Amino acid sequence: MAEHKNGVATNGYEKKSSPASSSTKSEAKPLPNGDKKDGIVKSFKQLRVASKRPLPKEMGDGSYRVVENRPGLKQDIRRLRGRDLKTLLEIVKAKVKGETQQDDKTMIMERTIQLVANLSDHSKVQESLTNSFISQLWNSIDHPPMLYMGDKFRFRQPDGSNNNPYLPQLGAARTPYSRTVRPKGMSLGAQPDPEAIFESVFARDAFRKNPNNVSSILWYWATIIIHDLFWTNLQDPNQNDSSSYLDLAPLYGSTEKDRDSIRTFKDGQLKPDCFADKRLIGNPPGVPILLIMFNRFHNHVATNLADINEGGRFSKPAEHLSPEAADAAWKKRDTELFETARLVTSGLYINITLIDYVRNIINLNRVDTTWTLDPRQEMGVSVGTKDLSESGTGNVVSAEFNLCYRWHSCLSEMDDKWVQDFYTELLGENYGPMNLQTMMKALKAFEASVADEPSERTFGGFKRGPDGKFNDDELVEALATAIEQPGGAFGGRNVPRIMKPIEMLGIMRGRKWNLAGLNEFRKHFGLKAYETFEDINSDPSVADALRNLYQHPDYVELYPGIVAEEAKTPMVPGVGIAPTYTISRVVLSDAVALVRGDRYYTTDYNPRHLTNWGYKEVDYDLKVNHGCVFYKLFLRAFPQHFKGNSVYAHYPMVIPSENKKILTNIKRADRFDFSRPEPTATRINIIGYNAAKYILEDQQKYRVCWEEGLKHLMGEAGGRFMLSGDTALHAQQRKCMGKLLYNDTWRNAVKSFYATTAEKLLAEKSYRLAGKMQVDVVRDVGNVAHTHFVARMFNLPLKTSENPKGVFSEQELYMILAVIFVCIFFDIDPAKSFPLRQGAREVAQKLGGIIEMNVKLANSIGVKGLFTSKPDKNDDPLARYGENMAKGLKKAGLSTEDIVWSQILPTAGAMVPNQAQVFAQTLDWYLSPAGEKYRPELARIAALETGDETDALLLGYAMEGIRMAGTFGLYREATGPDTIHEDDGRSIPVNAGDRVFVSFVQAAQDPKIFPNPGVVDPKRPLDKYIHYGVGPHACLGRDISQVALTELFRAVFRKKGVRRVPGAQGELKKVPRPGGFFVYMTEDWGSIWPFPTSMKITWDDGCGTDLFTLLFWCRSVPWWDLLPETTQAAPFIISSFQSQQIYSPAEIAAVLALMAFESGDFQYKRNHYPGRPGQGTANMQMPNYNLLYAKSIPELAKGWQGIESVEGLSDQELGDLLDDVTVDKYNFGSGPWFLKTQCKEDVRQAFKTDVDTGFQKYIEECVGTDLQPRLEYFQRAKTAFGL
């Protein structure tokens, strides 16, 4: 039989095997050269065919005409093998399902090659599949490429050039307008007078408001878009001085000079409250205010980009550079920050345009749907769309659309009045009739009135302050008023008369451009041409006017036609702003062209260019406001005026009263605040130690301000949580919970839990990478340990290996509790508040519902609960501790609702993230250069046996770490006027309602309280630390937190040479905030979060000194193989050493060596020879010791109560005793118990001086047996533990 390799016969052929040599049948394949006899027969047939051919007369050159006989479908089918059919079926299924991502692990590409290669050569099927394969390969890469490297293409150019790399001037500023429609028909030889057109079909006699109550803000937004796209050159009207892209040119300018005029050239910032395009000052104040909001948003973005410094893109220049090199580096950094901030800011601009603006245009804001018309939708081969609308190819705006976007009929009554007053301001009273001459005079006056320097410009009567900014109160007042003003309606006879000369110019401009007429324009977009004037507008007066002006609908000009057209009636959804018929269709086409053609909003719009944080900062979430993001702009620009859920900020494009109806109809009104925006309470920062104590200890003058957040999440019961208020009820709640938290057994239960859990998590979550142990000590240890704690104590549905039916994973439950905490105690970022509160309420209700169900089950029928672990309460002191707490709350008279919503859930939420943060910040400081010198001492203390002295010392170091690195503070609200005397001598007046923020950062460095504050002193008095708060609302869980922190520190610093992993993953990614505070980045660096999220540490190879490392990571040594079913035995062994507080590697090695020897390498739990009744366990203890051992175990003690000796016990009774103590969780604990309880102190002390001496004393004096037979096992254990 042929030799096989990997299941395929060598060389692809297989010789025939005779029946005698093979027991399996195989298809015979001929050898390549075939059989000699068959070749002769075939050659003869070919000669016979050739002899029958006619003479070659057809071609003229004496040759035969070649006729190619291609193999047919039948031949291809015959050649298909079973695996080929399977491949073909998979290809067809993928096509039908529209799958675009191949699983290359299935080798589908290679199997396709096999399929095609096996078909008949040159068959049509083979050719078709080959062509399809080549097309797929070809289409995987752009031809030619449209994306290029380098700043020239990465950043927007001031004039909009290079949007299309192959046509760099396509759509650039100062290039000609395009023409959308080719004019084919003839127009009237004598066109009607523009003034007559205005007076008859344009002019507003009485204001008609928009039928959908669209506010003036939408028209302000449209004004920005219009000025972004159109700026007709005065000397050459065919030229557009703006780019054809929505690049926010009104803010940034369309020339390098304009762009530079608003830059500070420092840190990528813009000059305060400036914008480049002076034309916008000639619009109602709301328009420039929107641009100022974008200015502020840009500076917010630039600041955060620099602070986050993703990938080192915005690092400050090195100090050693020459002055010239440093100057160049600073300039490059400024440019990088400015241009990246522009990309991000423009991203928000386009998202507001495509979501908020377009949703209102087509009335999607009135329905509960997340569907949106986003032109950036991916299509084409990559996503399985057959017909491709290309993207990122560029755009050129047309002259027709220059006229289509003149929406002057939409001016509100207020803005009509403003324009009139503006002309009066420019020209004075009694300036005469409003005509072209008057308008040109006004334009000249306007041009002269606007300063060349953007930072000196003013508008709307607003004045700049010393910092260059306008007064926020005045800007917000103007904005709120505009939001409340409905705009005008589309349709004939609604253009304010003050706009007459501008409209006349528009008519004249359309004629000079020789644009197609209204009907030609409509037909181009697939709309039916108007046949009568009544089709254009059913209002008889408008139809008659048009008839008298134009004679026939085909003669109606484009601009007069689209202004005079009838407006659509609102439709839900479909028609929102109620535009005229033609406008409603063409504006959507233009929106798609503008956005889809813009490379910076499509193919180059990604986190790599905007940074992860920048991309996410402006991205929309369809779960929040159906994707609307206008609130991000409002709340970043005016964080002290708009509430996080203000309807004025979230839906400013519709007047508030109409929004109330809309949101009520879609059942969302309860999420929003409908009050007018007003300045929020003043925040007063207090930094002194004594001032902090003064505020926190006087709850009459300074009350807690967490009730609203608690009620939002927990309902009315949340208002009864101890931290919700300052009444006698809240004090009683605190007293009750404190009594239940700190019972007689709390310290041992908490200490044992954290000691075991810390080591368990370090073992389970760590991994070996490049020869070193690593673990994410924040995400997978610190955060998770506290999550396990509250889950065990409050019986929460945590999914673990022990409780696989739990509902929430470790990370999910931690995040739920963190979100709850932030929503209640740290909801200080208005721009993030709304989505945070909505998400927090959803998860809090879900978790609270499960807890409430379980509490009811436990109180009614005694069931532990659904989806929770079922530990034996006698074997789980923490669970028993938590159960007693719940019973105590019930006994105190609390209802199930109160137990859950005013106690368990808020307490869990308050405990976990705060304690996790304490651990992360403290550990981070000791791993930093500042704390490095203290690490050897921490490692020494952590290696010692636990005890009051070592615990106090370890806690002292932890508390000092918090003092050095902790960023903690608390808010209080002043109940009345007061004066706070700061530690530095300042007197700070306070008024009722002021929010006072007490910072502990500077207070922790007060030399009067902490002498030598820059030095770590682990023996400082604990009562001096105030980062847990002081006064009636001091952290109730402080003592628990300190025990937990001590055990976490012990577990981490037992690791040999513990340190950060190299690079960014070893750093706690922080973003600085004023006052010495920090916030943190999520792991993807896409969002800022109040709590640490990730930091990886490593430690040296070797067994180390902690139990889990000893027992899990030293597997290469022989003794490990002695453990039976290690995954089951190890936890019990570790738990027993932990419970007996044995941490010395020498003692652990000795006990394990003895147990392995006595149990015959853990094969036996009972005495095998001579078969002594009652003798057994892994430690092979005599019956009298097993009785003592059983009585030391709470759940076994009751069964042996009253029996003081094994004397007189029957063999059956001795067997029962042995059955009890040889259950795995007790069997492997016998050795540690024996050492701890039966050996004298001098034996254990001997291990500390000399390992071998200690083992000898242990075997001979304590166990009382021969040393020599047991030395081999001890030597193996010593080798394993590096002793």
UniProtKB/Swiss-Prot annotation:
Region spans: Fatty acid alpha-dioxygenase: 130-476
Positions bound to heme b: 227, 408
Co-factor(s): heme b; heme
Residues annotated to bind heme: 1035
The keyword Transmembrane helix appears for this protein: no
EC number(s) from the headed UniProt entry: 1.13.11.-, 1.13.11.62, 1.-.-.-
GO molecular function terms listed in the Swiss-Prot or TrEMBL record: dioxygenase activity; heme binding; iron ion binding; monooxygenase activity; oxidoreductase activity, acting on paired donors, with incorporation or reduction of molecular oxygen; peroxidase activity
One Pfam family named in its UniProt record: p450
Keyword presence, Protein transport: no
Sorted UniProt keywords: Dioxygenase, Heme, Iron, Metal-binding, Oxidoreductase
Function as written in the Swiss-Prot or TrEMBL entry: Bifunctional dioxygenase (DOX)-epoxy alcohol synthase (EAS) that converts linoleic acid (18:2n-6) sequentially to 10(R)-hydroperoxy-8(E),12(Z)-octadecadienoic acid (10R-HPODE) and 10R-HPODE further to 12(13)-epoxy-10-hydroxy-8(E)-octa-decenoic acid as the end product. Linoleic acid is oxidized mainly to the R stereoisomer of 10-HPODE.
UniProt-recorded name of the protein: Bifunctional dioxygenase (DOX)-epoxy alcohol synthase (EAS)
Species this protein is from: Fusarium oxysporum (strain Fo5176) (Fusarium vascular wilt)
